């Protein structure tokens, strides 16, 4: 079996989203914003938004890797239930997205009267994405 196409697909799934995330950081630097030392609410919001985006990129990459692994194991016959497992993973991810959104909307509402509301929501999104990424890596041994 030729593994080169699978390797290239896997590399594409990982590298393209990471390149986009790196471009965001370069954009902040070009704007003169140092996310390690923010000086305004606007800068803080931009930086926390970037962190949430980075976490989301990593989560999406990990999710695609899990699906790809299930598809490959189903195709080569090493896992007789991987087709069904992939469908269940898709449904679980959709349900998780709804949970995350509702949870982070609640965090935003709780902080709605202050200037930290956007940052609080972005922090919530980041934390959820990081937790889900860890779960997928653990569950699917990625």
Question: Can you annotate each of these PLM segments?
Answer:
Residues 11-14, 139:
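Short, leucine/isoleucine-rich alpha-helical interaction segments at C-terminal helix-coil junctions
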Residues 1-11:
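Bacterial N-terminal signal peptides that target proteins for export
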Residues 13-21:
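Hydrophobic h-region of N-terminal signal peptides that target proteins for export
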Residues 22-142:
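N-terminal alpha-helical modules
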